[in-house]
From Swiss-Prot:
Disulfide bonds: C171-C181, C175-C186, C188-C197, C202-C212, C206-C217, C219-C228, C233-C243, C237-C248, C250-C259
Tissues expressed in: Highest expression in kidney followed by spleen and brain. In brain, highest expression is found in hippocampus, cerebellum and olfactory bulb. Expressed in aortic valve, corneal limbus. Expressed in ribs periosteum. During a fracture repair process, expression increases in cells of newly formed perichondrium/peristeum surrounding the cartalaginous callus.
Keywords: Disulfide bond, EGF-like domain, Extracellular matrix, Glycoprotein, Repeat, Secreted, Signal
Biased composition regions of type Basic and acidic residues, renumbered to the chain: 1044-1061
Keyword match Disulfide bond: yes
Organism this protein belongs to: Mus musculus
Gene3D superfamilies: 6.10.250.2590, Gamma Fibrinogen, chain A, domain 1, Immunoglobulins, Laminin
Cellular component terms per the entry's GO annotation: CA3 pyramidal cell dendrite; cell surface; extracellular matrix; extracellular region; hippocampal mossy fiber expansion; neuron projection; neuronal cell body; tenascin complex
Pfam families recorded: EGF_Tenascin (PF18720), EGF_Teneurin (PF23106), Fibrinogen_C (PF00147), fn3 (PF00041)
Family, as annotated: Belongs to the tenascin family.
Name of the protein in its database record: Tenascin-N
Domain Fibronectin type-III: start-end pairs: 264-353, 354-444, 445-532, 533-622, 623-706, 709-798, 799-882, 885-970, 973-1062, 1063-1144, 1149-1238, 1239-1325
Amino acid sequence: MGLWGMLAFPLGFLLASVLLVASAPATPESPGCSNKEQQVTVSHTYKIDVPKSALVQVETDPQSLSDDGTSLLAPGEDGEEQNIIFRHNIRLQTPQKNCDLADSVQDLLARMKKLEEEMAELKEQCNTNRCCQGAADLSRHCSGHGTFLPETCSCHCDQGWEGADCDQPTCPGACNGHGRCVDGQCVCDAPYVGVDCAYAACPQDCSGHGVCVQGVCQCHEDFTAEDCSEQRCPGDCSGNGFCDTGECYCEMGFTGPDCSQVVAPQGLQLLKSTENSLLVSWEPSSEVDYYLLSYYPLGKEQATKQVRVPKEQHTYDITGLLPGTKYIVTLRNVKKDISSSPQHLLATTDLAVVGTAWVNEETETSLDVEWENPLTEVDYYKLRYGPLTGQEVTEVTVPKSRDPKSRYDITGLQPGTEYKITVVPIRGDLEGKPILLNGRTEIDGPTNVVTNQVTEDTASVSWDPVRADIDKYVVRYIAPDGETKEKAVPKDQSSTVLTGLKPGEAYKVFVWAERGNQGSKKADTKALTEIDSPENLVTDRVTENSLSVSWDPVEADIDRYVVSYTSVDGETKQVPVKKDQRSTVLTGLSPGVEYKVYVWAEKGDRESKKANTKAPTDIDSPKNLVTDQVTENTLSVSWDPVQANIDRYMVSYTSADGETREVPVPKEKSSTVLTGLRPGVEYKVHVWAQKGTQESRKANTKAPTDIDGPKNLVTDQVTETTLSVSWDPVEADIDRYMVRYTSPDGETKEVPVSKDKSSTVLRGLRPGVEYKVDVWAQKGAQDSRKANTKAPTDIDSPKNLVTEQVTESTATVSWDPVEADIDRYVVRYTSVDGETREFLVGKDQTSTVLTGMRPGVEYQVDVWAQKGTQESRKTSTKAPTDIDGPKNLVTDQVTETTLSVSWDPVEADIDRYMVRYTSPDGETKEVPVSKDKSSTVLRGLRPGVEYKVDVWAQKGAQDSRKANTKAPTDIDSPKNLAIDQVTETTLSVSWDPVQADIDRYVVRYTSADGESKEFLIGKEQRSTVLTGLRPGVEYKVEVWAQKGARESKKANTEGHTDIDSPKNLVTNQVTENTATISWDPVQADIDRYMVRYTSADGETREIPVRKEKSSTVLTGLRPGVEYTVQVWAQKGARESKKAKTKAPTEIDSPKNLVTNRVTENTATISWDPVRANIDRYMVRYTSADGETKEIPVSKDQSSTILTGLKPGMEYTIHVWAQKGARESKKADTKALTEIDPPRNLRPFGVTHSGGVLTWLPPSAQIDGYILTYQFPNGTVKEVELPRGQQRFELQDLEQGVTYPVSLVAFKGNQRSRTVSTTLSTVDARFPHPSDCSQVQQNTNAASGLYTIYLNGDASRPMQVYCDMDTDGGGWIVFQRRNTGQLDFFKRWRSYVEGFGDPMKEFWLGLDKLHNLTTGTTTRYEVRADLQTFNESAYAVYDFFQVASSKERYKLSVGKYRGTAGDALTYHNGWKFTTFDRDNDIALSNCALTHHGGWWYKNCHLANPNGKYGETKHSEGVNWEPWKGHEFSIPYVELKIRPFGYSRDRFSGRKKRSIGKARMF
């Protein structure tokens, strides 16, 4: 460590001391002085600068040492002149080496010492004359008993002295006001004592048993009280009692000579033990604050647990214990936080109950039993089994499997027998609770099953009988189509006949034995019935070479039918027919031949019997019947001859009106001619063959005779488009006439004419055309011969004759041409004065010019057509000639709005001239001019417009031809030339358009340096953009109009271009709160760039950027906000246009995503909302099996409910925010939906003692079910079932009771909702049995716990243990000793109320025995069953009654019988005694001396409640007549039942113990 380090602490301490001490005022104000002007405060401060290299840590002075020194003034001091402050500034130089530092410190100390000496001198000077007048003398003496203080101008007296000059002695405490001071000593007033009279004297001077200290007696150890006159009790009774003459009288709950002990608890005992709990009780005590119960496994005291039990409670169920473990249970009473001495109890929990047991496999001779190993360790299992109805029981030892389950295969069993099986876990000498189940071996099945004597519908079945005792056999036979029938066969038969079978079917036959609802394995065989034969074989639809055969189908399932047919000459054929057909057609037969037909069914190689019949074929009919050589009254008929041997042919023909004739034709002919027919008649012709009375089918055809044609055809009444045709009518009966007319070019039309007319008019003809006309008669499709002629139409006249192109001497006429084919046209025109001219025009012309006409004359014009000598009608019109018009029209003296027009005058006599001028856009004006003028000036014209000018003469309504010319006005110049829309490289120039119609505008722009450019733009434009300009340059702009070579005056203005703006502005590197922007720099010389960014809600920031930079980072942005970013350049006050872009920050993602309120198909999720302004949230949830759904959620929500989920499924949930197409990062979580409950929980098959529950599984994947059902006494039983199970049988239930049942599904720790139902057993004979005999009569055959009802009153239930086995059963057991684990040395209250576990050792209770045996008409008998390890005995008394509590539960017993000897008669009539209630006649308390509670007399002959295992005389469990007083009987059971009850008088099925369940 360097020297700086060594000196750091002394120097720091020194500096702090200087700052704190030296700054104090030098002279405080004297209390004896009041003139403030004399007060002077002297202070000095040090400011020491220490080099930074020094390791000196100096804490800041809490009082500021500012240069003004104000901190040195006390509050309220305002006289600055009286305050003298010295400030000392000391600076230490940085030392070159450690010795330099030491020298510096020494110098510092020396300097400070000198300053302090100077300060002391100054203080001495300041102190002079500071004290008030006369006070200075005190400083010379203070009477020799004090010290003068110049600071205060007063004496500070020594101890024992007082006064201004310390000349007066003082007494201690000024005698405290209880005496007077004499020469420094107190003389006390009575009753005070002491050197300072501070305390009163002690009472009675502490009675000689103590010392008085400051007025209070300090008593000797064995005395107390204010005056120590009372003798002290031990420990002053510990505050838990009062002391009287040295003896403590304790409060209730305390004991001991000093009342320091709390009364210990009494009667700690075990009421009930289970696998993991011990129910303990003790005698209640109202004088405690609470009980302290502790317990630990034997030998593991360090594992002690302690519970605090309220004083109102005197039982406690210790839970969470280990099965099969011994525990030390300790109970203490606690009062005023003092614990009593403990009472201990050694108790053992039951071995863990074996889990569910079941029969895995049942065979005829074995049962495979399996059960779940308990959670605790066991050594092995005892498995007992025997027939349910017999006494034989076999026991085997089964080692515990290392697997979760153990099993044992019981073999060598009797078929069809129900066995009772018990599994008991063993650990050391401790047996666990047994689990009971039943198993039934299968019935052996029939063997050697055979079928014989099979017919079409019957079969006989036989078999070897089974060994088992059965009720019947069942025979089931199943057809191939699945139809099933069953029949029962008596158990003493081994064969039966199956009837009602279907023919040809292979039946599967099963035979098994049944007893009750149990069936054996099925033996099977097959029975094949014979095939039945077809019936009702018939033939029909016979033709000459085919016939149809049909039959009723067989019942048997066959492969096919076979049809055989044989002709008279012996030819035979066979045809297979499908099995689903019931008919077929035989083809290829010979006509007129008789056949024999056979039909039978086949299946494989089996055939049915054959059915047969006979059938002859028909004669074949003539074919190809045709008619030819038809005339109006004859026709020829021919046909192909038949194959059959016949006698003749027959021909019949029938007219349409029914007239029939018949003609025979020899068999060797095949044609004939029919004569005498009527014209135009259709005949139906039939031809057939005959042989004897047999006829073939008729061949037929139709043959119409020809129709006669019309005659004398003529035409008349011809026009241009019509002509009339007529003829003589035909004789035949026809449908109509047909008229056809054909032009020379082949155009043809046909017209039907009614049969009752003989003329018609043809219309729509073309003029001047010669038509060929044909007329004929029709009937159906038959036509007569045609009559014909020719007829031409008239020529048509010209139409639409008009006059046009009229001049002063000519006129053009035109017309529509005629349709007719003509030679020429003729034109004639005649003036009003009768002058006529006529000329010919070619047929192809439709107009001509009339010449040589006189001006102003109206002519009539006629035009007509000619063909040869044939002429059309004439067409006429009128044609007037025109007057002449002006000539040499010229314009001059043109301005922008006027021009002058002149012309040569017309020769004609007119009324006026008309001048019209029209602009190009159609605006027209007309001006009349006097007939004697030939010029005029047009005014109000538009500039630059070329006008069309027309001039003509008028006379009346007639106008001459117009003379015309064109005259343009001058062009006007552009106006209001202006520059707008300026950019860095363009100027937009606009102007008001000229009025003139121009060709173009010319634009010229010239820069300040003289560079000039010129360009043309369209006349329709009124603005243009000058491009390619240099930024910031001033330009002169000129604009003028042009039309052709003509130009307007020039308009001009000036303007300059803008600064260019940044380009390619882009955003990149965006985060939630920053964004980087960049741009291309401008070309212009600028001062800076400006960046402005504005959020969507209008928040704007603006920052400058140096001109040499082209990017910047925007900070302080908000997440998910789209910012509008603008960047522009600045130079002076001028700015470029702003470049814009968008910069959306990233959306922040949802946080703290959690799920809650999860149901089977919904889950509520919530999250912290994002800060960003978004459109929506998106939620995606994906099930474990991959199904995914997405839903949008409003941006205002931060939670949503997911619906449509699958029960019991884990979902992965993602939530993210969206704005437009943008998305935040996804937050995720998981949600596990609840399991849905089972469905349709229903009972069925309910009996007196049980029923079956069924349900449908939930949709969720589960591990299993928990089924819970409740007994009438409130006991709830819970059964865990595997997931594949959907039914459960409840057994051993009480009759006529409704059991609430609930079922939940579970998966791991998950539970579904509960579904509930009730199962009501069938009512019993005794709905509320009053004792075990009635319970037994309700068909409860197993011993165990049951609920009875006192006197049958449903409101007074009592749970008792019923012995259903001993001597016919029906016993209420009220006492049992068999293990010694339960202490029977109990108080009176315990014996009254009862104690213990009815399934183990217990005492039912005197109150219950009294209620059972008194106040009822039933007389009870009592039985004592006594057993040692190899002997047993019993004693029965035919009467038993226990009196009320008022009579101390006096015992009454009747007559004895049995093998144990009469011990109870001695106790008859005696009251019950316990160690705290002595009701016997002995000198001492028999219960106390014999360790029990009983109906003692002068003690006992029977002591069943004595100390278990005790062999001392009369202290053990004794039955003196049997084993004497020195043998403790290991097993005693006392029980009662109605006198004379016998089970043999009642019947009922046996039953297992309550609550046992059997799984399927």
